[in-house]
């Protein structure tokens, strides 16, 4: 249970390395002992096979991607679950994954957050710099997975997910815990005024997560921006766990669109509820 080789004692040990012959992934320490949760942030490594672990159909051949996804689920003990993903559009739409939604299917649904209270249903978002946020409660069987890039952050997607959790599952933000996974850091994410301007107009606290970086340029801190939004929504600071890993700095272990360009593959954040005893389906 060590941290991924080339990533230094990363995030103060908040992520644990897990490896099989086909998958290498990072597990949040905060969730490693949770009896009803499985969670992973995949790396770009297909375990000890030496192959690349791309999980996006847009970036690889469908049979290979399907096999990679199944390997990840197997590594998490979720091989018989449904993996739910949506068409990510950098907005704030939230998809509630209930029995009716599973029956209809999620194909074509545009959203950047998924919420469910169903056991043995895995939620997944693709990432290659954007921030994955896992939301869960200790006293209520409900989980959410959020995809928060620059525009998702602008549209307050994490707050929308929290609102949906409270409305549909009567679980207020004060009862929610959050894990913020690997994402591009301010060290590697410089933006010009055109990109920063909307934040200046809509966020009175914008200077807390934009760092001046030369004339008319700023470095965006996605982790801080979303931490502030979670806190503003009512999630206690002590219930927010942040893994400060920059995907661009560690492009040899994690996918990074900013560092690699349009050809970058995609990793995935995955979270699922289990039940005390596995029931046959």
Model-derived features with residue positions:
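Active-site microenvironment for binding and transforming phosphate-containing groups
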Residues: 1-281
């Amino acid at each position: 249970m060590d941290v991924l080789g080339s990533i230094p004692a990363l995030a103060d040990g908040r992520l644990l390395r897990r490896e099989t012959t086909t998958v290498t992934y990072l597990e949040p320490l905060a969730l490693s002992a949770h009896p009803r949760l499985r969670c992973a942030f995949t790396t770009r490594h297909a375990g000890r096979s030496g192959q690349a672990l791309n999980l996006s159909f847009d970036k690889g051949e469908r049979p290979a991607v399907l096999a990679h996804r199944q390997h990840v689920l197997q590594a998490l003990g979720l091989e018989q679950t449904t993996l739910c993903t949506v068409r990510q559009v950098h907005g704030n739409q939230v998809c509630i994954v209930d029995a009716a939604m599973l029956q209809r299917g999620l194909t074509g649904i545009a959203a950047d957050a998924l919420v469910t209270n169903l056991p043995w249903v895995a939620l997944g978002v693709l990432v290659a710099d954007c921030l994955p946020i896992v939301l869960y409660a200790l006293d209520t069987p409900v989980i959410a997975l959020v995809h928060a890039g620059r525009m998702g952050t602008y549209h307050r997607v994490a707050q929308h997910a929290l609102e949906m959790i409270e409305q549909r599952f009567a679980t207020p933000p004060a009862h929610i815990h959050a894990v913020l996974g690997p994402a591009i850091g301010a060290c590697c994410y410089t933006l010009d005024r055109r990109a920063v301007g909307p934040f200046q107009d809509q966020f009175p606290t914008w200077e807390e997560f934009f760092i001046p970086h030369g004339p008319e340029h700023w470095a965006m801190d996605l982790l801080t921006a979303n931490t502030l939004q979670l806190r503003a929504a009512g999630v206690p600071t002590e219930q927010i766990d942040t893994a400060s890993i920059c995907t661009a700095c560690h492009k040899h272990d994690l996918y990074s669109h900013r560092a690699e360009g349009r050809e970058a593959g995609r990793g995935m954040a995955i979270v699922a509820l289990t039940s005390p005893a596995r029931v046959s389906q």
